[in-house]
Amino acid sequence: MLGPDQFRDVSDFQVPQVVLRLEKVIPSDPTLLNDAVAEITAELDCAACWDDVEIIGLVVREALANAIVHGNHCDPEKTVSISVAVNEDCDLLMSVKDSGAGFDPSALPNPIAAENLLAPHGRGIFLIRQLMDEVDFKFDHGTEVRMRRRQNWLE
């Protein structure tokens, strides 16, 4: 194990090449959500890496909806950006960024707790965390949700 002032030489690491990259910026208008999700999932479907592109579409929908509704409060003057990359190993890397003030992910209520089961909101981040291998948040001039799903995530 390396100490706090030691660094591993990463020059010999093999980094898979990106074979598909999508970047899209949309106004924070919920009526544009379906078209944006359809466009992104169609491109990913063409990459032919997954049999379950619908699940990835659900993640895209939830991440974009959270950014539009909760991050930017449906203000069409504010934008949401999404960046999607697929590498040669068919790993999916995705980032969704809004202009919102941010939030504390650890403070989100448990959506499967009895008192929250019928709540109209509160399942998006939970679903994203369940369906992706890695999810983290960055708060710098907005909120960025960064997600990764490995091709072999079910193995």
Question: What do the PLM-derived regions correspond to, one by one?
Answer:
Residues M1-K24, I68-E155:
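Conserved beta-strand-loop-beta-strand hairpin that lines the nucleotide-binding pocket
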Residues Q17-W50:
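Helix-loop-beta hinge of the Bergerat
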Residues P30-N34, V53, G57, E77, ...:
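Short, structured helix-loop boundary elements
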Residues A38-A65, L117-A119:
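Conserved short strand/loop->alpha-helix "switch" segment adjacent to the catalytic nucleotide/phosphoryl-transfer site
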